[in-house]
């Protein structure tokens, strides 16, 4: 979606309602697609990967927080939810359906791309404190992401 403030300068109330309807519909459908891929991942036996948000949304098996940006006093609604599978997902499927002789090579490929895995037990408990494994977050730096969200709020 384009920058919201640019659009508001030149549209009527009716146009604004249509813009919001379209934004809500597109964002909702993107979230439903992401959630569907996430649940299919569970049916294939894949667990949550709560570090993928720190690696360019590398997996649908994370819990994605809506990604909003702020630039020049404008909220940007592009790519609120990622589309398609991530790099971790593709390697997970490759690993799950490969011969034993190929597994080490696939794991090395994940390491070379800095693709990591952090499960629920490091991200979900009250006493968990892993800096890169948190539910409903984005980005590599939790403090910087919080600052971005606070600007938007």
Regions found by a protein language model. Give the residues of each.
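Metzincin-family zinc-dependent endopeptidase catalytic domain
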Residues: 1-36, 43, 66-70
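Catalytic Zn2+-binding segment of zinc metalloproteases
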Residues: 40-55
């Amino acid at each position: 979606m384009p920058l919201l403030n640019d659009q508001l300068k030149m549209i009527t109330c009716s146009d604004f309602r249509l813009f919001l309807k379209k934004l809500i519909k597109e964002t909702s459908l993107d979230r439903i697609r992401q959630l569907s891929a996430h649940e299919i991942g569970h049916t294939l036996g894949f667990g949550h990967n709560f570090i993928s948000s720190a690696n360019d949304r590398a997996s649908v098996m994370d819990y994605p927080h809506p990604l909003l940006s702020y630039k020049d006093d404008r909220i940007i609604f592009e790519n609120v939810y990622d589309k398609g599978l991530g790099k971790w997902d593709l390697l997970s499927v490759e690993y799950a359906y490969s011969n034993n002789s190929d597994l080490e090579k696939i794991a090395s490929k994940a390491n070379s791309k800095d693709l990591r895995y952090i499960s629920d037990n490091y991200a979900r408990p009250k006493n968990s404190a892993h800096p890169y494994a948190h539910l409903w977050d984005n980005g590599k730096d939790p403090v910087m992401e919080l600052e971005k969200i606070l600007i938007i709020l």
